[in-house]
Amino acid sequence: MDTLVIAGKSYTSRLLLGTGKYKDFTETRAAVDVSGTQIITVAIRRTNIGQNPDEPNLLDVLPPSQFTLLPNTAGCYTAADAVRTLRLARELLDGHALVKLEVLGDQKTLFPDVVATLEAARILVKDGFHVMVYTSDDPIVARQLEDIGCAAIMPLASLIGSGMGILNPWNLQIIIDKVKVPVIVDAGVGTASDAAIAMELGCDGVLMNTAVASARNPILMASAMRKAVEAGREAWLAGRMPKKIYQATPSSPSEGMITGSPHSAANN
């Protein structure tokens, strides 16, 4: 079976889904179910998973017994804040070690601060975390994060929440070719074709939130994204035909084609 393996655990779904921006927890659960995802991301600074006892708890709707939770550090702008946030998540989730690290460098673009990201990754890996890390599409940084010991590299396709799709497929392709841990596109996916393209490039998975939660029909979009990720993966496994410039090839065989008879040719 074709599975995604992260930190030693296998998953049949290659779609990772965020839990923010839905109108309520009921819609969140419905989108998660339709998407078929097995890994859901949770922004610890914005979502209650037990740190606020008097508020609705996401874990009542998406229990850890049914899904792999991926606590993330959305909203963190320093390595220290990111490390502190994920240590809190580990306490709230009874020692859960799989986390998503993101250290932002700019409030307007939400580009990652790669220097702070590298610093936080070193601390977290040394502290026993399995770190899936949001980063730029710089292949050198991706290799450095892999060398530190990160469990998955998560380069952006374009700005978080922009829906602009994959702006630099060439860098993504280099990252895919150079690192051995899973490469999961994170940020910028806007519609199903973006997810399919990411998978056709050879990405191991796609993480999204806004593309589903901000769609006119989030539940239907979750279904579309599931199919797109599956189709893109199958296309990559199948191997696309080579592109040819100025070399058209008929799809029908040329043998046995009907040609004009010598008699008719002579009469002409």
UniProtKB/Swiss-Prot annotation:
Active site: 100
Binding site for 1-deoxy-D-xylulose 5-phosphate: 161, 187-188, 209-210
Catalysis performed (reactions): [ThiS sulfur-carrier protein]-C-terminal-Gly-aminoethanethioate + 2-iminoacetate + 1-deoxy-D-xylulose 5-phosphate = [ThiS sulfur-carrier protein]-C-terminal Gly-Gly + 2-[(2R,5Z)-2-carboxy-4-methylthiazol-5(2H)-ylidene]ethyl phosphate + 2 H2O + H(+)
Class of the enzyme per the UniProt entry, highest EC level: transferase
CDD domains linked to this entry: ThiG
A GO term for molecular function: thiazole synthase activity
Protein function: Catalyzes the rearrangement of 1-deoxy-D-xylulose 5-phosphate (DXP) to produce the thiazole phosphate moiety of thiamine. Sulfur is provided by the thiocarboxylate moiety of the carrier protein ThiS. In vitro, sulfur can be provided by H(2)S.
Protein's name in the database: Thiazole synthase
Lineage: Bacteria, Pseudomonadati, Pseudomonadota, Betaproteobacteria, Nitrosomonadales
Protein's gene: thiG
